[in-house]
C-alpha cells in the first residue's frame, strides 16, 4: 500500500511505506490479514458456522494527550487519528491478537486519515471492523460481494473421480479463492452425491492448510520480532559485564614479565650447558639420609670435626693427661 503526501500547493507525491523490524511493510501486513479474514469467513460460511474471532479494537478517539498535538486535535472524533503540532494528521491502528501498532502514514486532512484507518481496519478485522465511515465502506463491500457471488456461481468447482485439473479464475478479482481445483468429468453425472462430498472435503482441507500456513508464518515473524530486542539486550549486558570484569581485575604478572624462559627455550639451552657444572640431586641429599650417632655412645668422646665442646672438657686419647692447666689464665 502506497502512502500519499499532499500539501495545499504541491501535487501528491507517492512514497514507499516504511518497513518494520521484520522486513515487512504495512501494505504486506494488511494484505496478509485480508487474505486471512477472507479464508476464515469463506470456511465458516461453507461449514454453516459463524467465524470465531476476538472483539476488534475500538480505536482511540482522544487523539494526543491534553495540551499536545495540533489546534484541531481536541475537536477530532475519528478513530485512530490525531493531529501533529504543525497541522498534519496521522493514522495508526493496532493489529489483532498481538496489539502491535502500525503506522499508516501522514495526511493533509482528518477525513483522509480516517479513510486510511477504515481501509486498514477492514483488512485486519473484516466485517467486524469498527469504522469511521461505515456507510461508504458498506456500499463498497456490497458491490464487491455481489460480484464475488456471481463469479462463484458461474465457475463452480466440481470434484469427481481421480483426475484433477487446476483452474484459475481471472474474471473475478474480488473472489478470495481464485485458485480452486476445477475438475470436470463426464462421469460426474452418474455420481452426483460422491462429487459433492468430495468437493466439500477438498475445499475444507484446502482452507485448513491455507489457514495453518498463514498462522505459522505470521506468528513466526511476530516471535522473531519480539525475540530480537531481548537478544540485543542480552548481548549488551554480556558486553557490559565483560568490561566491568576487565576494569576490576588487577594487573596480573605472567612468567614472561619476570623474564623467565619458556619451556622450549629451556630445552634448547640444555645442549649448551657444561656437564661439569651439573650435579646430581641424589648426591646432594645423600648425607641427609645417613644415620646419626648411636644413643649409647659416650657423650664425653667427641669426633675430630666437633667444635661444640669447651677445650677443658676434652680428654686425651693417647694416655697423656693435661698437666699444669691451673697455671693457665683462662
Curated annotation (Swiss-Prot):
A motif (Nuclear localization signal) lies at residues 13-54. Residues 230-247 form a coiled coil. Residues 237-248 have a biased composition (Low complexity). Its main location: nucleus. It comes from the Eukaryota. Gene3D superfamilies: AP2/ERF domain (3.30.730.10). One of its GO terms (biological process) is heat acclimation. Residues 51-65 have a biased composition (Basic residues). Induction: By high-salt and drought stresses. Pfam families: AP2. Signal peptide: none annotated. It is found in: Nucleus. Residues 1-24, 46-71, 225-248, 283-330 are annotated as: Disordered. GO terms for cellular component: nucleus. Residues 1-10, 294-306 have a biased composition (Polar residues). SUPFAM superfamilies: DNA-binding domain (SSF54171). Keywords: Activator, Coiled coil, DNA-binding, Nucleus, Stress response, Transcription, Transcription regulation. Residues 310-321 have a biased composition (Basic and acidic residues). Residues 77-134 bind DNA. InterPro entries: AP2/ERF_dom (IPR001471), AP2/ERF_dom_sf (IPR036955), DNA-bd_dom_sf (IPR016177). Expressed preferentially in roots and stems, and at a lower level in leaves. GO terms for molecular function: DNA-binding transcription factor activity; transcription cis-regulatory region binding. Belongs to the AP2/ERF transcription factor family. ERF subfamily. Transcriptional activator that binds specifically to the DNA sequence 5'-[AG]CCGAC-3'. Binding to the C-repeat/DRE element mediates high salinity- and dehydration-inducible transcription. This is Dehydration-responsive element-binding protein 2B.
Amino acid at each position: 500500500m502506497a502512502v500519499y503526501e499532499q500539501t495545499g500547493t504541491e501535487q501528491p507525491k507517492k512514497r514507499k511505506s516504511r518497513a518494520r523490524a521484520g522486513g515487512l511493510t504495512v501494505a504486506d501486513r494488511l494484505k496478509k490479514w485480508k487474505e486471512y479474514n477472507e479464508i476464515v469467513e469463506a470456511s465458516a460460511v461453507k461449514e454453516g458456522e459463524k467465524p470465531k474471532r476476538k472483539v476488534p479494537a475500538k480505536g482511540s478517539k482522544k487523539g494526543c494527550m491534553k495540551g499536545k498535538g495540533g489546534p484541531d486535535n481536541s475537536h477530532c472524533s475519528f478513530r485512530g487519528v490525531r493531529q501533529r503540532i504543525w497541522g498534519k494528521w496521522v493514522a495508526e491502528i493496532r493489529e489483532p491478537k498481538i496489539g502491535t501498532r502500525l503506522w499508516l502514514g501522514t495526511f493533509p486532512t482528518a477525513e483522509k486519515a480516517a479513510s486510511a484507518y477504515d481501509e486498514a481496519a477492514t483488512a485486519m478485522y473484516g466485517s467486524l471492523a469498527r469504522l469511521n465511515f461505515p456507510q461508504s465502506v458498506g456500499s463498497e463491500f456490497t458491490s464487491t460481494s455481489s460480484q464475488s457471488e456471481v463469479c462463484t456461481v458461474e465457475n463452480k468447482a466440481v470434484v469427481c473421480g481421480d483426475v484433477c485439473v487446476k483452474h484459475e479464475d481471472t474474471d473475478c478479482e474480488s473472489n478470495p479463492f481464485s485458485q480452486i481445483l476445477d475438475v470436470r468429468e463426464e462421469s460426474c453425472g452418474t455420481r452426483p452425491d460422491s462429487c459433492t462430498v468430495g468437493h466439500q472435503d477438498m475445499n475444507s482441507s484446502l482452507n485448513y492448510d491455507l489457514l495453518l500456513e498463514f498462522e505459522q508464518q505470521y506468528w513466526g515473524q511476530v516471535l522473531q520480532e519480539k525475540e530480537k530486542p531481548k537478544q540485543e539486550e542480552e548481548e549488551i549486558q554480556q558486553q557490559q559485564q565483560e568490561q566491568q570484569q576487565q576494569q576490576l581485575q588487577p594487573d596480573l604478572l605472567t612468567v614472561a614479565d619476570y623474564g623467565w624462559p619458556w619451556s622450549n627455550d629451556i630445552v634448547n639451552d640444555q645442549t649448551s650447558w657444561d656437564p661439569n657444572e651439573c650435579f646430581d640431586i641424589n648426591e646432594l641429599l645423600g648425607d641427609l639420609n645417613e644415620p646419626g650417632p648411636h644413643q649409647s655412645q659416650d657423650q664425653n668422646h667427641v669426633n675430630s670435626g666437633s667444635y661444640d665442646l669447651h677445650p677443658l672438657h676434652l680428654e686425651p686419647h693417647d694416655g697423656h693427661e693435661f698437666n699444669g692447666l691451673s697455671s693457665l689464665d683462662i
